[in-house]
Amino acid sequence: MAKKRIIGIMGLGHVGAHVAYSLAVQGIADELVLVDQNTEKVASEVQDLRDAVAYIPHRVTVRSADFTEVGDCDILVNSVGKIELLRGNHNRVTEMDFTIPAVRGFADKIKASGFD
């Protein structure tokens, strides 16, 4: 039996939600692990994806988690950001003022989860 392909997606805004959907529909992952600080958003995305994968020809498991539960993932996609910071400003570096401290806030949790 082949090893289960598990991909974690951190941040379920515009980018993260689309990445999750694309991975599910294309059959790239056997399991998607969704992480976001907004628990209502995570629950909504998990349910939407579970509904969608019911109609595709391959099996994909979708679950929510927090940063401490990503140790079994093969790949982590970091799509954490704050797109609102770009309104009226098309310089993507502006968003780094949010993203750098955010990554520092969860990096140790990811390490502690056993992700390598």
What do these predicted regions represent?
Residues 2-7:
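Extreme N-terminal starter segment of soluble prokaryotic enzymes
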Residues 8-9, 34:
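Hydrophobic Val/Ile/Leu positions in short beta-strands of Rossmann-like dinucleotide-binding domains
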Residues 12-13:
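Glycine-rich Rossmann-fold phosphate-binding loop(s) that bind the pyrophosphate
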Residues 16-17:
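N-terminal Rossmann-fold NAD(P) dinucleotide-binding loop
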Residues 23:
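Aromatic pocket-lining residues of Rossmann-like dinucleotide-binding sites
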Residues 30-38:
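Conserved glycine-rich Rossmann-like NAD(P)H-binding loop of the short-chain dehydrogenase/reductase
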Residues 37-73:
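Conserved N-terminal Rossmann-fold NAD(P) cofactor-binding segment
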Residues 59-115:
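Rossmann-like NAD(P)-binding element
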